[in-house]
Structures are given as structure tokens and as C-alpha cells.
Amino acid sequence: MKNSKKATFNIGQIVKHKYYPFRGVVFDIDPEYANTEEYLMSIPQKIRPTKDQPFYHLLAENSETEYIAYVSEQNLELDDSDEPITHDELY
């Protein structure tokens, strides 16, 4: 059995991406990468995460749209803007 890293963020917390202009609310957490190799390779190499860390499912939004995002812990930080998330799937 692998030793998975404990998740830093919790379900319901609002986080933002460190490099891209979007934020979202955590609705699920994978203890390590659980998506396709193709998806992983689509992430720019400069910020491509390792698989052995928590990955977060987010109800995400930016200034143009809302969507579901799958993001590694290393590329997220807590959002301290106090602005609400207005994603349609929250209501």
C-alpha cells in the first residue's frame, strides 16, 4: 500500500489556481492522480504535477465561464478573496 499525502484542502473550501486565473470550490479529492495519461501530458511541462499527491475536483469559474476542473495540490492555494463562488451546480 502506498503512503498517500494527506490533503491540504477540504471539501467545501474555495481555492484558486497558482498559475491560471480561475478559482473553485472543492467537491471531491483523489489521494493521488486518477485521470488519464493523456490528460496529464496536456498540462504544460513547467507546471506538470507528479502523480503522488492529492488531486482536487473543483466546481471552477473564471471571468468567462464555469466548469469542472481537476487540479493537483501543488498548483492550488487557498482563495482568501472572500468572494462567493457562483457556479450553477452549487444552487
Stretches found by the model and what they are:
Residues R48-Y91:
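Intrinsically disordered, low-complexity, charged/polar segments
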Residues V15, V25-V26, V71, I85:
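Extended aliphatic helical segments
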Residues Y33-S42:
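Short, solvent-exposed secondary-structure boundary/capping segments
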Residues F22, Y39-L40, F55-Y56:
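Broad hydrophobic/π-residue packing in well-ordered secondary structure
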Residues V26-D28, A60:
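Residue-level recognition of conserved beta-strand positions in structured domain cores
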Residues M1-I14, Y19-R23, D30-Y33:
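Mixed-charge, Lys/Arg-rich low-complexity intrinsically disordered regions
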Residues I14, I47-R48:
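Beta-strand elements of modular eukaryotic interaction domains
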